[in-house]
Amino acid sequence: MRISFLHTVDGNKRVFDDAAKTLGLRVDNLLHEVRSDLREAVQDAGTFSAALKGETNRCLLALAAHADAVILTCATLGPAVEELESTQVPIVRADVALAAAAGKVGGKITVLCAVEAAVEPTRKLFERHASDTVTSVDVIHIARVWALFKSDNIDECFAAIAASANEAYEAGATVVAYAHPWMAPAVNLARNGSQPLDSVHAALRTVMQRIGGPSLGI
């Protein structure tokens, strides 16, 4: 069973490969394409134009032609999926999978976000997928971690993410969610007996549920 990915951060390839192994999936069945230029074009323009959405969807459909499922890992490009008509294989937004997983848990949801421009879209997304048991959605901008990540200060970056997760749990969060896939390695660094949710595992589990569960590893 083949899964294709459209990334805008090169480091996400390894993050998804590592997570796939923990879920019993075969890494040699994963195909990664990185298009950082699409995210950068949206950021430079300040809007997700119809032309950029069209280019994003062309990439997704090309990946879908050679896969049993496609995962879009960049939240910035996520709205393009809504304009796709029915496709032959599932196209899963990692951010939507995360929001849905958090919504099922319920209670007080705290989302850690590294990009200020993504705070409001993230809040709206999580509120849209909140179940009746969700009491609140709080999106916290942890500004310094994106700069640390881009400068390759990875250990300090993940330590800062975990510290923010610990603070959120201490403040009463029922569930803490990491908004960006590249944050996933910091999941196991959190304390307080709770494990934050990440979009990497959430997206892969969503594909497994839609396509065929553990048989994906065959």
List PLM regions with ranges.
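Non-catalytic structural scaffold of enzyme domains
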Residues: M1-I218
